[in-house]
Structure formats: C-alpha cells, structure tokens
Amino acid sequence: MILSNRNGLKNTRNMLRVFGGLNETYSCTEAEYSAGINFSARNFPALSTRLPRRKLREEADLNGMYHLNGLLTVCGRDLVYTPDDADEMEVTLKDAVESGRKTLVGIGTRILIFPDKLAFDTASRKVSALGAVWSGKNASVEFAPCDAEGKVYEVSGCGPAEPDKPTDGQLFLRVEDPEKPWSSESTLEVYSEASGNWSAVVLDYCRISAKGVGTDFAAEDTVTLTGSAAEQAGQWNELDGDRIVYDAGTDALRVKADPGGEWFYGRLTRTGAAVRWVSLDGSVSREFVSAEVVELERRVPDMDYLTECDNRVWGCSNKENVIYACKLGDPTNWFSYRGIAADSYAVTVGSDGAFTGAATCMGYALFFKENTLHKLYGSKPSDFQLSSLRCRGVAKGAARSLCVINETLYYLSPDGVMAWDGSIPTKVSTALDPARLRNVKSALGGALDGRYYLHLVRGSGEAQAVRLLVYDTERGLWQEEDVCSYEMAGSGGQLYLWDGKAIWAADADREESWQQAGGIEDGVSFELVSGDIGLDSPEELYLSRLTLRLEAEVKSRIEVAVSYDSGAWETLAQLTADGRRCFDVPFVPRRCGSLRLRLKGRGQLTLRSLTRTSAAAKGGILAQEVN
C-alpha cells in the first residue's frame, strides 16, 4: 500500500529554566519579568516568592532603629532595647530623647543618638549626654593658680630678695618688678631645709572651684571656658577658650593654663556680675563688674551624617563644609587638640554644595555630595589625608541608602543606584526605570545575605509612591517586595523592618521563639508579569504551545492569565494547593505578535520552567515539503 503524502510538521521546543529578575526597560526578555511583587532569587535559577516575615511586636511610633548586641528602637520619646541574649530582659527608658527622626551610629558598646547628642550604652543599659554644660550664673566661682597636683598656695611675704632666716617649707614670692609685684614675671619659691636652697614652684594650672562644677566632666575632657573675666582682671592672658581638664571632682576641676598677666598671683572670685581679686598674701584686693556669665562646655558639633571608622566617629553637616572626627575611642570629645595620636580632627573641604551622606568602606571614611566623593584615610591626625573625586555621589535625601555589602558600598545617586568598590562608582540599576529613581524624597538601605534592600519614597500626599527594591548583589538581579521598610536595621544575620505599625524580621527562621509576637505571615501575596514572549520568533514560526511548570511550597492559590498584544488579561487557570504540589499548566495560545503571562495569588510559589513549542508556518498554513 502506498500512503499519500502528509503535511510535514516542523516543530521546535525550547525549555527556559534560568530566570532573571525585574527589568522595567524595553530590553526585558521572556526570561525576566516587567513588573511584579514579592519574588526573589533565593532558589536561582528558578524564580520563587520571598520568604515569609516574622512579626516581632506592634510599634506605631518609631523614630529610629539600630542593632548593636541587641535591637535599640526609638519609640516616640522612649528608648527600648531588646538584647540578643534571650535570657536578658528588655529595657525601656522613658522620655530619654526628644521626639523626631534620629540618626544612629555605633562605637564600641555605645549607640550615639543625634541630633539629641546622647549615647546609649548596651552594657550598662544607661543613657548619657555626649556634651555637657555648666553655668555659674547663680554660683560663686573661684579661679586660682595651682601646681600639677591642684594645690593652691598662700605666701607669707614678697620682695626682691629671699628672707635671711627661712624655715623649712616657707613660701616666698620673689619680685622682679616692684611696680608689678603680683605679675607672672615674679617667682613663687619654697625653702628646703634639707638642701638649704630655694626652689621655684611652677603654677601652670588653674583650679576652678564652685559647687557642682565638675559633676559632668572628667579627666582628659576638653572644655570651652567663657566668662571668667580673667583677662579683664589681668590674671591670665588667655584663660577663656578650649582647655584640657586634668583632674575633676564634684566641686573643682583643674585645667592647663600658662602663667601670664600683671595680677597673676592671686585668687579671682566671681559671684554673679561682681568680680573680686585678692593677692596670695591677702594684702591687696581689687573689685570690678563683668556682665558675662561663667560657663564651661564640652562641645559636640551639630552633625547630620555619621559613620564609625577606626575607633572614631566621623560626621558632617549639610549646613557647613567641615568634616569632624571625635577623639580616639571617645565620642564625647570633638575639640581635643593636644598634638597626640588620640586627638580629635576637623578639616574644611573646598567642594561646592551641601553634604548628602557619610559611610565607611574599605577602611576609608567617606563623605558624599551629589557630585563629589571625599575620602579620608590615615592612622592618626598628623597623617590623615583627604582626597576628592568628582563622580555621581549620594542623592539629596538618600543618606540612609548607603549600605556596605561584601566589601562594596551601594547607594542611590541622582542617576540611579551605584556600587563603589574603592575605585569609580558604577551603575547597577540599568534594569530599572530611571524615571522612578529620580526626585526621590527619601531613601533607606538595608542588607541581608548579600541582598541590598532599597526603600524609596517619591512625591507626597496622595501622589506619594513608595517602593521596596531588592538587589541580589551576587547575581546582579533586581526584585521588588511589598513595602515593609519605613525603618530598617541589620544585625549581619537578620534584617529588621518597620511597616508603620509593627516591627518584622525578614528571615523568620532566624528569630528565637521568645521574640515571637504575631508569628509568621500566613501567606505571601505575589504577582508577576512576564516580559513579551514571541518577539524573538522569525516570521515563519509561531507559538503553538506554552507549558508552565509551577511548584507550590505551602497552601497556596494561583491564577494564571495571558495578555495578547498588550490587550486585556484573560484567565487561563486557577489553581489551589493544600500543601507542597507541582502543577503543569499547558495552553495553546492564539495567533499573535507577542504575549505576556501573569502569575497572581497568595502562598509560596516557585516557577521552575517555561516550555515553548514553536511551529513553522508559511502563508498562514502549515508548511509543507516543497518539491
């Protein structure tokens, strides 16, 4: 029997098993998706929904969050600290701060809180002020020359020559100029019977005495003294100004002060506006009036952006072009200049524009403007060096987007999301719609397992648009998750997020049971719109069949829909699973130029593969063998 000729079908079959991420540009391929929410690359090369989060506790008013040996949250005016150790109790400090947004940075066991200029110690669980101010408005304050031990002397006599028969320990003021007997040119001497000689007593310190004057200060502090009236009295030429505290008690402190002035050897007492000077032997006194008030202050500069590098806290403000660094290991002292390696540091930069952020990466303290990167490096103030690079810096309002992941710094610039690894910043957001990354009102960054979380806010009021983008730094893939990130804090092994109502943990399995408040999310709502499928087919091929391989990990419901040539969505299948289950969703698409697929539902879903079957066509009919 001879069979008649049959039409020859020329079909090809391709299976797509490696999926990319979000691509909002024209170049989005069928292996990527053009829009979607709550998908991740955790099961790469498959495409899976994100892991469910765990709710830790309700919190409606959060002004800041930081992790250091535990999670510190600024709740309104209160501080709440939850230690990592489950055996330790949570600590709440009422009315510890002012209400408002906070900038937090850690150094050692302390978390610094700005603009309040406070420090929370995670070891002692106490809050202390970084700066300190003491005012002598209603106090009696005495200034007296003293030696290195803080001792103040009284003399029994003075003159151009020492007494003939002195006693052991006798004090005498040897005068060089009889017209100025109490000036610093004279010399205070003490007699030693053992040696039979007079020796000079050096009074190169000043003892400041008043009730409570030393309560808030400590040895090695640098304080700014004003209103002493010492220069007016002629006792010290430059007592007012920055002074190093060498000893501090409750009612007295000792500062370094070089001798000087025509009335040096005496005690100066201020009570309100009245000033009285009395010589060391009590024979001479002078009185006058000064309108100033005595004040001692340990100053802390106003700073908007902070970072820790090499046991120093570095900071800058968007109101001035100065970069500050605190004293080595001491964030309470910012103006200590003694010429040693532990000194504070400050430098003025010459670039234009306001600072927009600060961070630490690769051992450098980095300070950004919108078009400039300033890099500070060195081991001590004497060899600190500042270099500047004109490049795409941090966008205005995006200071908190700065985040270090695997030795690379990520941040939002006016031109998109950048990555800096020590050389030139490179753009990593080419797959995202650039228009949705511009004119950002605020941006916040976080990190977990090599993923960069970027919270963006654009516009305000009803027109406000909020997004949470996630960048897989190892694979170079972008995803988008539902917004739960108005505040973020990372611990290295966990990322804490605040959605405006409660605090969540990004990875539920890493939280101890004692921290569970609301438990794990019962399901994750997801949606995905694929890129255009079929645009790469030549004219003589068309899609004859598509098969989706889906896997539900938990109880889930899934809707599969298709859109032909950017038309309306048509439902292909509605699937439900009571537990782990795999689905094959085949369908025959109608003739079209291109199509898109949409996956929508709730639960946990993994897209394993997409199989395309293409058939040959010619002139609108199946291709036949041509003799």
Over which residues does each language-model region extend?
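N-terminal beta-propeller domains
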Residues: 1-88, 142-150, 298-375, 456-470
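Beta-sheet repeat architectures centered on beta-propellers
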Residues: 2-70, 396-397, 407-408, 415, ...
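Small/polar beta-strand repeat architecture
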Residues: 4-8, 130-131, 192-221, 226-300
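Trp- and S/T/G-rich repeat-edge/linker motifs of beta-rich repeat architectures
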Residues: 40-59, 79-99, 121-154, 194-204, ...
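Short hydrophobic/aromatic-rich beta-strand motifs
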Residues: 71-72, 109-113, 163-190, 220-226, ...
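Short, surface-exposed terminal/edge motifs of secreted or surface/virion proteins that either
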Residues: 78-81, 117-133, 170-203, 234-237, ...
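Structured, hydrophobic secondary-structure cores that serve as assembly/anchoring elements
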Residues: 360-366, 371-374, 391-421, 535
